[in-house]
């Protein structure tokens, strides 16, 4: 299975940024790609979405989520809840192994296959193998610096890449 990545999202000062590394790992010991894009712009470029987990599963979920965004006219929270319900109850979808971070100008959410839609209290979220490291770094930077959301996301991911062997420093950041 292809897995292992880090995605971090930061909301600060009316802006949101989502950063992802570029590494794709096969099994436990083989890097097969260094420059993968794990963040997408959805629904008329008004929503950012990043994934951690199986690439094929994530692409399926991106497509489903974009359909929900269209169905609910860009309402991120409603689309996220409906995706989580489908993901949890559908016999095929519930086998998908991935996590999503989605954000628009007002909301930042983590969506999981077990039906959770989580909005972080502090405007910072991270998923994937390096997620705990990126989350800690981003929280510290939000609390103790005047850095912008994009710079915090980039630096938090750089810290995770220094620690997590499944995360590289080929960082892509998208912002709204």
From Swiss-Prot:
Family, as annotated: Belongs to the peptidase T1B family. HslV subfamily.
Assigned keywords, A-Z: Allosteric enzyme, Cytoplasm, Hydrolase, Metal-binding, Protease, Sodium, Threonine protease
Protein name according to UniProt: ATP-dependent protease subunit HslV
Residue positions binding Na(+): 161, 164, 167
Keyword Phosphoprotein carried by entry: no
Active-site residues annotated for this sequence: 5
InterPro entries with a match to the protein in the record: ATP-dep_Prtase_HsIV_su, Ntn_hydrolases_N, Proteasome_sua/b, Proteasome_suB-type
Catalysed reactions, as listed in the record: ATP-dependent cleavage of peptide bonds with broad specificity
Keyword Cytoplasm attributed: yes
HAMAP family: HslV
EC supergroup of this enzyme: hydrolase
Role of this protein: Protease subunit of a proteasome-like degradation complex believed to be a general protein degrading machinery.
Main localization, broad class: cytoplasm
One Pfam family per UniProt: Proteasome
Domain of life: Bacteria
GO CC field: HslUV protease complex; proteasome core complex
GO BP annotations listed: proteolysis involved in protein catabolic process
